[in-house]
Amino acid sequence: MFGQFVEKRESMQTNNKMAVAPVGKLIWQMSIPPLISMFLQYSYNLIDSAFVARLSENALTAVSLSFPITTLMNAASIWIGVGVNVLIAGYLGERKQDEANITVTHGLLLAFGIGALLNLLSLLIMKPYFGAFTNNEEIYQLSMAYMSVCSFMQIPNMAHIAIQKMIQATGNMVAPMCFQIAGVVVNFVFDPLLIFGIGVFPAMGIRGAAVATVAGYLLSMILAFALLLGKKQKVRIKIKGFHLQKWLIGRIFTLGLPSFIMNALSSFMVTFVNFFLVAYSDTAIAFFGAYFKVQQLIVMTVNGLIQGCLPIMRFNYGAGNRDRLHSAFRYGTALVSGMMILGTLTVILFPAQLLGLFTASESMRSFGISAMRIMAVSYLFCGWSTMISTYLQATEQVFPSMLIQLLRQFLLLISFMWGLEKLLKITGIWLSFPVTETATFVLALLIFRAGRKTETLCSGTKTQ
């Protein structure tokens, strides 16, 4: 019933729409739902943090220390999801329905297998990980309590994101947004009930926030499967005659790798920033955790728009339509630039209000307001670099796409942070973000221009 309720009804077949609909209108249709979905996806941790901060600053620090682990889990989910999305969109562009269905089955198997593995790994690394970042026994115990429950979110998280990307590849962008909304609503409603023990619910503290998160992901997975198994889906699970194809698994990993790197590097980056900040105070770690959730909400919401452009570019690359490929890139870049300017202005003008969401102490506000304004400047260049990386990904230029993300979120950032922190102390840490994004944009533009000179379209040749 859920599948019938949210099924997008169109008079035009999706493949025809991707090939002939006006590019500007098509990007809006394809991008708004994943934009909202990414906003909702990254609101989970922000919602948890906002409620948990009302327990204590130590509780906020605990959730902040857990953020790199949960971000790495989300990155793995997006890795499989985007790899499957790119392949399915390409196959549909080439009118290879059977290959698209086989890709669906492989994607689901990978989601469950890798999800179970990450569940186990997160449970194994918790103690040494949290022990490395705090000597405060209360923060350590709160971190363990939160992450011991959140570890079990990975299978439902990977499964529902994989299905979300499969359905988006067919042009149906509304249905995935619906089951995403359902999960966030559950998390938002049950967070205060389980954290503070409202009504008949027990007061579980920080553990209650984790239970609400897992419940939200579980509901999203159930609704996603109900949709995928509906009769009117353009891709289906192929069981008859199915056998694992190693080359296809490798293709999924390869095509989704740039998106994984973009998301996973943020996890490693937060870990390294925490190593710098631990020399200053637990409050500095709590602040950066709060700020980074705001940043991720802005950046990853824009990334949702970018991911809406990806299947359009990929489809027309598969169909050999150079003009529509480039038109989608130009229009998408203009939209991303506008949204990043809006995000920059929001953080620069309202830093105190944003910190207020996390019940910030006077100590945190004393340096946090100026730090947020400094780091917000980086948004102006971040969107352009990410859009260039996505274009390279859509046209199967995987290594240059990955290189841009490596430079932006790790190699250049850590290098600038190390040097500027030596010169300017904690202010140098904040300044390293806009400096890195500016340098990455210049390098990404050079990589993009070099790639355009050698770019070739597949013109209907097979995608494998």
Predicted regions and their residues:
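Helix-terminus/linker motif at the lipid-water interface of multi-pass membrane proteins
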Residues: 39, 43-61, 130-137, 193-204, ...
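Transmembrane helical elements of multi-pass membrane transporters/channels
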Residues: 29-48, 149, 160, 183, ...
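Residue-level signal for short hydrophobic patches within transmembrane helices
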Residues: 20, 24-43, 47, 69-76, ...
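Hydrophobic transmembrane alpha-helices of multi-pass small-molecule transporters
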Residues: 72-75, 187-191, 221-225, 297-300, ...
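Short alpha-helical transmembrane segments in multi-pass integral membrane proteins
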Residues: 1-31, 88-155, 201-256, 313-378, ...
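Structural signal for membrane-spanning alpha-helices in multi-pass inner-membrane proteins
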Residues: 122, 165, 191, 195, ...
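Small-residue-rich hydrophobic transmembrane alpha-helices
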Residues: 60-120, 157-176, 274, 287-345, ...
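Short runs within selected transmembrane alpha-helices of multi-pass transporters and secretion channels
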Residues: 81, 150-168, 176-184, 209-224, ...
